[in-house]
Amino acid sequence: MNRIERILEGFDPVSNGLDEDFVLTKLTGMKGCGCKVPRNVLLQLLQTFKTDLVINNDEVDIGLDSCVIPLRHPGLRLVQTTDFFYPLIDDPYIMGRVTCANVLSDLYAMGVSECDNMLMLLAVAIDLNEKQRDIVVPLFIQGFKDAADEAGTKIRGGQTVRCPWLLLGGVATSVAHESEIIKVDQAVPGDVLILTKPIGGQVAVNSYEWIKKKNGKIEELNLEIPKIEKAFKQVCEQMSRLNRNAAKLLHKYDAHSSTDVTGFGLLGHAENLARVQKQPMEFIIEKLPIIEYMDEIADKMIAKGGEGFKLYQGTSAETSGGLLIAMSEENAKKYIAELSSLDNAPAWIIGKVTAKTTDSSIARILPDAVRISVPSHI
């Protein structure tokens, strides 16, 4: 059974030797990249390092969970990224694939499509009994390994501990020539912004949880369960899909800037990308590709006085989301056509880059941004 077939079939605890009521996501109160410390808080906390932490230097570019380090060998760089989070789906195998894809995504965002080594990080929840542990952990490891194999890399170590919560993650390392790494600060006025996966993952995961918990939310908002289930399967597919093809094409089509969209949401990562440009730029987001029906859920939540997971503000968390890329419009159209063919999934031009007269770069979503409803393709 391949990845998509498994997602479409759904996870049955009983056929995997577990009790009928086993739910992996009960082992944590947080979900996926939604566990991230808010971006503004994290930036403040990082000031503790001050002179120890080099940010936006010509030689050492450091992100929030990745780094590019010059080696003593001319032209070579050590590219390294780490990530870990809590489970957000109940199939341990698919969760393993999602975890691996998410760890690799920061390499791919820099155009580095070859990973030389991975480490796996795993905290086994103490609430798992021995039988559950001996079924769940191997399934997770197999999923992580299969995704690593698909990425053309190997897992050569890691750390496994016991913990009050189930934690999943890893480290990805690549030694790359400087020419293999996309410069993130080269966006120019006239560039367009590309997004390679739709947003709405947090809405899909949480609304699916409402079905399982039977907490009254489905009835309160008058939601359609089949539509939520369909969206959830689509999210599982895109979270477990590697951004590797997207990374390879960054070089072919001369990308000027790139990042991946994860826990800080589309706008949060667009702001990060705008902030590191050499010249003051404005990243203007004009379109929001949203997984089908997730906008309707957000609308109904907002109508009840909620925030709709801040989907329209662009800060709704994504897990193993797509790449956000700046490149010329001419190349963007070719990039999207080839990527869509390789991944059998759509991508979009969602905005533009303009010059800014003030000293600081910003990103913003237009108040009347067009919402694109993206149907499932699996």
UniProtKB/Swiss-Prot annotation:
GO terms for cellular component: cytoplasm. InterPro entries: PurM-like_C_dom, PurM-like_C_sf, PurM-like_N, PurM-like_N_sf, SPS/SelD. Its cofactor is Mg(2+). It catalyses: hydrogenselenide + ATP + H2O = selenophosphate + AMP + phosphate + 2 H(+). Homodimer. SUPFAM superfamilies: PurM C-terminal domain-like (SSF56042), PurM N-terminal domain-like (SSF55326). The keyword Transport does not apply. GO terms for biological process: selenocysteine biosynthetic process. Keywords: ATP-binding, Kinase, Magnesium, Metal-binding, Nucleotide-binding, Selenium, Transferase. It holds the Pfam family AIRS. This is Probable selenide, water dikinase. The record marks K36 as: Important for catalytic activity. Mg(2+) binds at D65, D106, D260. PANTHER family: INACTIVE SELENIDE, WATER DIKINASE-LIKE PROTEIN-RELATED, SELENIDE, WATER DIKINASE. It is an enzyme of class 2 (transferase). It comes from Caenorhabditis elegans. The keyword Magnesium applies. One of its GO terms (molecular function) is metal ion binding. CDD domains: SelD. Its EC number is 2.7.9.3. ATP binds at K36, G63, L64, D65, D83, D106, G158, Q159, T160.
